[in-house]
Structures are given as structure tokens and as C-alpha cells.
Amino acid sequence: VIVDEMQDYSWIQFVLLKKLFPCRMTILGDKAQTMEEKQQDALTFLPGIFGRDIRKIIMNRSYRNTMEIAQYANRLTGIQDIELFDRHGAAVEERHFENLEAALDMVIEKWEQKRADYETEALILFTEAEAEHAFLYLEDRLKSRDPDGEYELTYMNRDSQNFKKGLTVTTFYLAKGLE
């Protein structure tokens, strides 16, 4: 049995997995990618479930991001023991807005500047309510700029079955793994 994204499983879920599948398991994950607000390190409770004879292999080379993004994320998470892949990109921009609508206006501006360069982009929000509000706001603003509807805006929720080109608005938990 292979279990991926171990950081998103709770103690009880691992107990159930062991009970349902009494065999050897390969459990993979990255505690820095948890979907919970607080990081939980499953390695603290896995020995209590599966016994002390656990072989732990730590892979600390990051290949997904540019050095600039990885260093910025590491400052936020406090994780410093990651070997970064030597790939560079633009510096991370941190912007602060008075409200969500001001941030969404900037999203429209940036998207319109770059949309010829990318087939798909995503605006990822924390909650479904925020994502739906953002989608409706963007839809209204984009319709007023382009009444013919050539703006390719999609709202992705739990019921979505298709992934379309353009700008997709969704939540972080639905976007996980789509990168």
C-alpha cells in the first residue's frame, strides 16, 4: 500500500488504514504542504500506530520552485533544512491591500497583462465563500470590460468536472496537486 500526502491524514485515519490493510506500507509526504492551519508531523505518531520499526528516509531537495519562491516560503514556515534546486526566477512580490476587492482589481490588471503568455492561471483562496465572492466580483468586473465574454473565467468547486483554459478561481484544498 502506498499512501501519499501523509501530512493531510490524521491519527485516526492512519489507525484505520493499518486496520484495513495489515501489510507493509510506503507513506510519503511533506509536512510543509499540510492543508491544516498548523503543521502536524505525522512522524510523531506513526511509530505508535505501526510500531517502532519504521524506516524513515528524509528527502530534502526541493525541485518544484525557483530558489526565490522556496526561500520566501522557508522564511514563512521556518523550515531551513531544504536543499534548493539551482533554478532562479523573479523575486517574490508581497503586496498588502485594504480589502479583497482591491486585491482582485490588481489580479485583473496582472492577468490582462500576462494572459497571452499563459493558457491557465489560478486565483487560490482559503475558503469556498471567499472563492465564490472573488469569482462573482471578477465576473462582474470582466463583463463590464468585455461584454462579449472573451475573458475565460471559471469557478472550480467540488462539483466541477472540467478544467478550462483561462483564469480559474478556487480554494487551496481543491487546487492541491494541480500545479
Residue ranges and their predicted role:
Residues 4:
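Walker B catalytic carboxylates
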